[in-house]
Curated annotation (Swiss-Prot):
Domain of life: Eukaryota
Entry keyword set: Chromosome, DNA-binding, Nucleus, Telomere
Main location: nucleus
Record-linked Pfam families: POT1, TEBP_OB2-like
Purpose: May function as protective capping of the single-stranded telomeric overhang. May also participate in telomere length regulation during DNA replication.
Entry protein name: Telomere-binding protein subunit alpha
C-alpha cells in the first residue's frame, strides 16, 4: 500500500463521507436545528447551542485520562472575529470550542485552518473572559467538517473529488443530517471565510512567536513558517525544515500518519512547540502529543505573504557539505514545480508494491527520495555515451569509436531508502537521457569525457557528492517497461 493510502486510511474508514451522490442518510424524523452566531449565543440559557464556525486554530486530539479524549479549537464567524468589535484593537478575536469523547476517532482532526465546523448540542460558558463552547460527543453532541476550498486537505493529496460542496468531508458518528435550510447558511459562511482570510492575517501577531525569539520562550509557543523541505527520516517520520519571516531555520519531526498533508513550499501554523535545549548541531522544535501542524486555506493573505517572502538560500546545507561527515541530511536536488504536489512514494512502494497497489499501477510518474550507494559505470568517463538514433545503440567514446552520434548520459544509481533499509537489496534508478528525460540533472552538457577534462572533473565532484553520507536525492521518476527513469530533476549544489 502506498504512503498516501496509509496516511488517509484512518480518516476514510472511521469518518468516510456517504454515498457518491453525497446525500446524507435520513433520520426517521427530521430535526430542524436553530443555528446561532457565536457572539449572540446566550450565556444564561441552559439550552443546547447549534452553530457553524470557521476554524482558525486546533490542537490534535489527545488523551487526558483513561476514559477521556479532548480536542480544543478556536472558531470565528461574522459576529466574532476582531477584538476591535469590542473596541480593543485589531488582533483576532474568537470563541473556543472544546470537544470531549471516549474514543480518539470520535474527535475531529484539523489539517487546515479556514475550514468550517458545524456543531450540534454544545453548551456555552464564559472562561477567562472568552466564550467557550463545550461539546460532549460521548453524550449527544455531534460535529461535521466542511471544506472552504473545493477540496479538503486530504482530498488534495489523495486526488479524490468531493461528493458536493454541501457534503462534509468528515463527521462524528455513523451518519449526519443536513437540512435544505442549511445550504444557504453554509454557502454564506464559506464565502465570508474566503473574504476574511483574504482581508486579514487571521493568525495575528499575538498568536505566534517569531523563530528568532523561540529560544527565549519558557513553555509552549506557536509558529507560522514555510516548509522548505520534507525529508523522510524513516518509514514513519518526516523531518521538516522550517523558516519564518525572522529568517531563522528550524527543524522538527512530524509523524507521517499524524500529518500526511504536509508538502514542501507550504506555509503552516504549528500549535504548541517547545525549543529543544539539547540540540547542538541544529535548531529544533519539539512537538507534544497534542501539538498540531495545519496548513492554510488557499485564500490566506498571511500564507501568501510568508510563501513569497521566505526563500531558501541553502546556507545550512552548504555548510554541512563542507564537513567531512555531515550530521544533517542534505537533499541535493529539486524537482520541477509542476510536480510539487506529487506525494512521495517509497522504494518499497515502487519496486515491491507496484503490481498489487492499484494507485501505483495506474500511474507512471512518481516522486521518491533515496540515497545512492554506488554509481555505475564506476569510471566517470563512461557516463556519457554516443547514441546512434538510427540503430538506437549507445557506444563508448573510448578510443577511436563513437563517430557522429549524439552525446547522452547513461548512468545507473544503486539506491536505498528508509523503507528498504533493513533488506539486502539495492535498487536501480536510471539516468538515460536519449529521450530527454533527466537531461538537466547534472547541469552539465553531455560531452566526450575522455577529452573534456572540465566536464569530467565536475561530474567526478557530483559523484562524490551523491555518494556522500547523509546526501539524498529527491527525484521525479517515470516508469517505462518496469524500469524507473529520472526526469524533471536537477542537482542544486
Amino acid at each position: 500500500m502506498s504512503s498516501a493510502k496509509r496516511s488517509t486510511s484512518r480518516v476514510s474508514k472511521k469518518k468516510a463521507a456517504p454515498a457518491k451522490d453525497g446525500a446524507p442518510k435520513k433520520r426517521e424524523q427530521s430535526t430542524r436545528y436553530k443555528y446561532v452566531e457565536l457572539n449572540k449565543a446566550s450565556l444564561t440559557s441552559a439550552e443546547a447551542q447549534h452553530f457553524y464556525g470557521v476554524v482558525i486554530d486546533a490542537t490534535f486530539p489527545y488523551k487526558t485520562n483513561q476514559e477521556r479524549y479532548i480536542c480544543s479549537l478556536k472558531v470565528v464567524d461574522p459576529s466574532l472575529y476582531l477584538k476591535s468589535q469590542k473596541g480593543t484593537g485589531d488582533a483576532s478575536d474568537y470563541a473556543t470550542l472544546v470537544l470531549y469523547a471516549k474514543r480518539f476517532e470520535d474527535l475531529p482532526i484539523i489539517h487546515r485552518i479556514g475550514d468550517i465546523i458545524r456543531v450540534h448540542r454544545a453548551t456555552l460558558r464564559l472562561y477567562n473572559g472568552q466564550r467557550q463552547f463545550n461539546a460532549n460527543v460521548f453524550y449527544n453532541s455531534s460535529w461535521a467538517l466542511f471544506s472552504t476550498d473545493k477540496k479538503s486537505a486530504l482530498q488534495e493529496i489523495g486526488g479524490q473529488e468531493p461528493a458536493s460542496d454541501l457534503t462534509p468531508f468528515a463527521f462524528s458518528g455513523k451518519n449526519y443530517t443536513f437540512e435544505k435550510s442549511e445550504a444557504a447558511l453554509l454557502q454564506n459562511i464559506r464565502k465570508w471565510a474566503v473574504q476574511y482570510f483574504q482581508q486579514y492575517n487571521v493568525i495575528s501577531s499575538d498568536m505566534f512567536t517569531p523563530l528568532n525569539k523561540a529560544q527565549a520562550q519558557k513553555g509552549d509557543f506557536d509558529v507560522v513558517a514555510k516548509i522548505l523541505q520534507v525529508f523522510e527520516l524513516d518509514e514513519y517520520t518526516n523531518e521538516l525544515k522550517l523558516k519564518d519571516q525572522s529568517g531563522q531555520v528550524f527543524y522538527t519531526l512530524a509523524l507521517k500518519l499524524k500529518f500526511p498533508h504536509l508538502r514542501a513550499g507550504e506555509v503552516v501554523r504549528i500549535r504548541s512547540a517547545t525549543y529543544d535545549e539539547t540540540s547542538t548541531q541544529k535548531k529544533v522544535l519539539l512537538l507534544s502529543h497534542y501539538s498540531n501542524i495545519v496548513t492554510f486555506v488557499s485564500a490566506s493573505k498571511l500564507a501568501k505573504e510568508v510563501k513569497a517572502k521566505v526563500t531558501d538560500d541553502k546556507s545550512v546545507e552548504k555548510a554541512a557539505l563542507k564537513q567531512d561527515v555531515s550530521l544533517s541530511a542534505v537533499v541535493l536536488t529539486e524537482v520541477d514545480k509542476k510536480h510539487a504536489g506529487l506525494p512521495t512514494h517509497s522504494l518499497q512502494d515502487l519496486f515491491h508494491n507496484a503490481d498489487t497497489d492499484k494507485e501505483i499501477s495506474s500511474k507512471d510518474t512518481f516522486r521518491t527520495q533515496f540515497y545512492i550507494t554506488r554509481v555505475e559505470p564506476v569510471d566517470v568517463k563512461e557516463w556519457v555515451k554516443s547514441y546512434d538514433r538510427k540503430t538506437k545503440k549507445p557506444s563508448s567514446h573510448k578510443g577511436a569509436g563513437a563517430k557522429g552520434g549524439e552525446n547522452i548520459f547513461q548512468v545507473q544509481f544503486l539506491v536505498k531508502d528508509a523503507s528498504t533499509q533493513l533488506n539486502n537489496n539495492t535498487y536501480r534508478v536510471l539516468l538515460y537521457t536519449q529521450d530527454g528525460l533527466g537531461a538537466n540533472f547534472f547541469n552539465v552538457k553531455p560531452d566526450n569525457l575522455y577529452k573534456n577534462n572540465d566536464a569530467r572533473k565536475k561530474l567526478e565532484e557530483y559523484n562524490e557528492l551523491l555518494t556522500k553520507f547523509n546526501s539524498y536525492v529527491d527525484a521525479v521518476v517515470e516508469r517505462r517497461n518496469g524500469f524507473y527513469f529520472i526526469k524533471d530533476t536537477r542537482i542544486i549544489f
